[in-house]
Structure formats: C-alpha cells, structure tokens
A protein has these predicted regions:
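Substrate-binding N-lobe of the ribokinase-like
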Residues: 1-48
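Conserved phosphate-binding/catalytic region of the ribokinase-like
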Residues: 112, 158-208
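Conserved phosphate-binding/catalytic loop of the ribokinase/pfkB sugar-kinase fold
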Residues: 44, 54-87
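Conserved beta-alpha-beta core of the PfkB/ribokinase-like small-molecule kinase fold
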Residues: 90-161
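Small-residue (G/A/S/T)-rich helix-start motifs and N-terminal tracts that mark the onset
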Residues: 13, 17, 25, 34, ...
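Short acidic/polar active-site loop segments enriched in Thr and Asp
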Residues: 13, 88-89, 138, 174
Length: 208
C-alpha cells in the first residue's frame, strides 16, 4: 500500500491488488479511494484485514496483527488478475507471505508471469527474496541488513554492499536497489553500474 501511495503522489497510474476482509478491509479501501488510488482487491468472506501498530515511547515497538486465511480459490482469482497484465507492465510484490499461504507463493506468481514481458519488483526478506531470483526479477529491494543476512556477512562500506549486490545479480536479479535508512540508497543496475544517493537531512518523525 505504501508503494501505491508514493506512486500516486508521483503521478504514476497504478492499481493495488491483494486481499481484504471485514470492516478493516473496507476502511482500507475507503482510505485508498480518498487518496485517488485505484484498487481491485479480492474480498474474502471471513476474517479481518490485519492492523499493524507502531508505538513510539523512547524506542519504537511494532505490533503486527495476523491477517485472514486466504483460500486457494482466492489465490486463483489473483492469478486470473495477473494473467491480464501486458508486456511492459510492472508488478510489485512486497512484504511477507500471509501465514495461511505457502512460503513459495511469490515463486508461484513469478513462474506464472515468466516469459510474458512483465517487469517484476520484489521487496521481501531472506528466502522469500533469494528463491525468486531464478525468475530474473527486474528489480529487488533489500535493505543493507537484509542483504548482509543473505550473503552471510556484515556490510560496512559501499564496496561491501556493491559486492553483495553483485552476488544477487549473478543469481538472477537484473537490478538491485539497497536501501540504507538514513544513509540513503545504492543501486546496482543491470549494466553493472553503481548509483549512490544520500538522504535529505532533517529530524526523523517516524520510520514508516
């Protein structure tokens, strides 16, 4: 959802896909509609769309709720939506897999799209990210800590991060964008060129 909000602010037409349930799902749809964001959610008959809470009290605490169970019939509906994507379209897969679905769900979706000319972007952690590299995603976006966990070492310099990003590129990723919180971001593009950008200086209000 955060991706969609940023894209809308930048004037990029996009549609939010996924699953919603209960009153919290209806609230999410209303909120996105108020921002002018197009949605095409699949409505589940049972459960509630999860609520995540961040508590700021000296240190930041995250409370992430559990989402509704997603039946196979709903996954098939999602796949039917993805089948409508055309060559050159962009699909962003972000976050964790719902507990009611197999951890191979991202692999299932990318395998279905393989060879259709759809540019896929994946923002996920550890195995979820590594296991989709065989489908050559257009872009992956680990943060520097996640990247370090994947390659099994601490990354302290831009050279360390670049070398680790090249490892994922060799495994199949076309472009690797590494976010580094207050230190900005580093992009290793498919031509092998490195692009580095810092962040505006200011006071952090929250980390979302």
């Amino acid at each position: 959802v955060l991706f969609r909000s940023v894209l809308a602010e930048l004037g990029c037409r996009n549609t939010a896909l996924g699953f919603v349930a209960g009153e919290t799902g209806a609230w999410l749809e209303r909120g996105l509609a108020a921002q002018g964001i197009t949605t095409d959610f699949i409505h589940l008959e049972q459960g509630m769309t999860r609520i995540n809470v961040k508590i700021k009290a000296g240190q930041e605490t995250e409370l992430n709720g559990a989402g509704p169970d997603i039946p196979e019939s709903a996954m098939e509906q999602l796949e039917a939506q993805l089948d409508k994507l055309a060559e050159g379209d962009i699909l962003i897969l972000a976050g964790s897999i719902p507990s009611s679905l197999p951890q191979t769900t991202y692999e299932r979706l990318l395998a279905r799209l393989e060879g259709h000319g759809v540019h896929t972007v994946v923002d996920a952690t550890r195995d979820l990210l590594v296991n989709v590299l065989q489908y050559h995603p257009f872009l992956i976006k680990p943060n520097n800590h996640e990247l370090g966990e994947i390659v099994g070492r601490t990354l302290t310099t831009d050279a360390d991060i670049t070398a680790a990003a090249r490892t994922l590129q060799e495994k199949g990723a076309r472009n690797v964008l590494v976010s580094m919180a207050g230190d900005g971001a580093l992009l290793l593009d498919e031509k092998g060129e490195v692009h580095r950008i810092g962040t505006p200086k200011g006071k952090v209000v929250n980390s979302v």
